[in-house]
UniProtKB/Swiss-Prot annotation:
Ranges that cross the membrane: none
UniProt key word ATP-binding: yes
Subcellular location: Cytoplasm
PROSITE patterns named in the record: GLUTAMATE_5_KINASE, PUA
EC class of the enzyme, as a word: transferase
Lineage: Bacteria, Pseudomonadati, Chlorobiota, Chlorobiia, Chlorobiales
Gene Ontology, cellular component aspect: cytosol
Species this chain originates from: Chlorobaculum tepidum (strain ATCC 49652 / DSM 12025 / NBRC 103806 / TLS) (Chlorobium tepidum)
One example GO MF annotation: glutamate 5-kinase activity
Domain PUA: start-end pairs: 277-355
Protein name in UniProt: Glutamate 5-kinase
Residues noted as binding substrate in the record, renumbered to the chain: S54, D141, N153
Pathway this chain belongs to: Amino-acid biosynthesis; L-proline biosynthesis; L-glutamate 5-semialdehyde from L-glutamate: step 1/2
Primary role: Catalyzes the transfer of a phosphate group to glutamate to form L-glutamate 5-phosphate.
Length: 361
């Protein structure tokens, strides 16, 4: 059912490479015109929009004729560095026609690793939104370390959606949504319940031609966000008026229904896979206490059998069983050194407080 007024007040719009590039791999002016016009219309209706866009590398392909023997990493760096200028200008030139200013933010995964850095970044976004400026975000491919690169911009959009406590994350791809491959005709699945887990049965083989992400990545990010209280839509960005349809409650693509929102720090921890600076190994008794669901339980030193890495208070750490299975993630309440000296002992303060603990479903 469509509504006269938008059902969301703050959204992230993630635009995939295959949405804004044509078959020749170059930026598609008509699609860019459409998307920026839709965003401008939503802003006029009072919706705050954060734009996460891929496409810098593809834009670079339309500018640079590479020569010499560059490694794949060097090639990506050159194309991203040159293409990002064209990409941001393509958006800003169009936003200007609507009286809107865009701001470029290039980030790396490491920017989300430190809590204080994370909070500083959030302050910047909030200030831009307060001034009615559109944050235009992309991964800083030119300087990103391979080990700390995002899986793709779907992951980046999820981190930003969580950080800014948005109402919805709209992931625009070049497909209509998640298809039900188990049903005749393979219809688009309109809604996904937060309890759904096995998405691979609905995924068709293949992935984006120029981008790094596929539908399974999108579903996993969407599922995690929905469990954190953020609605996620996966839809076709080339469909005319797609953002208006979704923002006003109309049916389009696949909607991942949100659960009750979680606390800010819990959201940060929940999306911190790959950002951890160490790990604690816990025994079965601690696992049972954390996962019983009977009451809120912090991770105490008595249940810890090992400590890995060198982390400080406030760093993200991984929680593992003795056989290496990841149980969850948490924000350390002490240093690795103190955790080692305390492990196995009773009556001491938690190594990870419940409010800063996220268990893998």
């Amino acid at each position: 059912m469509s509504h006269q007024h938008p059902v969301y007040r703050r959204i992230v719009v993630k635009v995939g490479t295959n949405v804004i590039t044509g078959r020749n791999g170059k930026l598609d002016p008509a699609i860019l015109d459409s998307l920026t016009s839709q965003i401008a219309a939503l802003m006029q209706d009072g919706v705050e929009v954060i734009l996460v866009t891929s496409g810098a590398v593809s834009a670079g392909r339309g500018i640079v004729s590479l020569s010499g023997n560059l490694t794949p990493v060097e090639t990506r760096q050159v194309l991203a560095a040159t293409g990002q200028i064209r990409l941001i200008n393509a958006y800003n030139d169009r936003f200007k026609k609507h009286g809107i200013t865009g701001a470029q933010l290039l980030v790396t995964k490491g920017d989300f690793r430190d809590r204080q850095h994370y909070l500083n970044m959030r302050t910047c976004f909030e200030a831009l939104l307060q001034q009615k400026i559109v944050p235009i975000v992309n991964e800083n491919d030119a300087v990103a370390i391979t080990e700390l690169m995002f899986t793709d911009n779907d992951e980046l959009s999820g981190l930003i959606a969580s950080m800014l406590q948005v109402d919805a994350n709209i992931i625009l791809s070049n497909v209509d949504g998640l298809f039900d491959t188990q049903s005749e005709g393979n219809p688009v699945i309109e809604e996904i319940d937060p309890g759904t887990k096995n998405f691979s049965q609905y995924i068709r083989p293949g992935k984006s031609e120029f981008g790094r992400g596929g539908m399974l990545t999108k579903c996993n990010i969407a599922h995690k966000l929905s469990r954190l209280g953020i609605t996620v839509h996966i839809a076709n960005g080339t469909t005319p008026g797609i953002l208006q349809t979704i923002a006003h409650g109309g049916k389009a693509g696949t909607k991942f229904i949100a659960q009750k929102p979680k606390q800010s720090r819990k959201r940060w921890v929940a999306l911190s896979e790959g950002l951890e600076k160490g790990a604690v190994i816990i025994n079965q008794g601690a696992i049972d206490a954390l996962t019983s669901g009977q009451r809120a339980t912090s991770l105490l030193p008595v249940g810890i059998t090992g400590v890995e890495g060198s982390f400080q208070r406030g760093d993200i750490i991984r929680i593992c069983s003795t056989d290496g299975k990841v149980i969850g993630y948490g924000m350390a309440s002490c240093t690795a050194e103190k955790a080692r000296s305390a492990m196995g002992q009773k009556g001491l303060k938690p190594v990870i407080h419940y409010d800063h603990l996220y268990l893998v479903p």
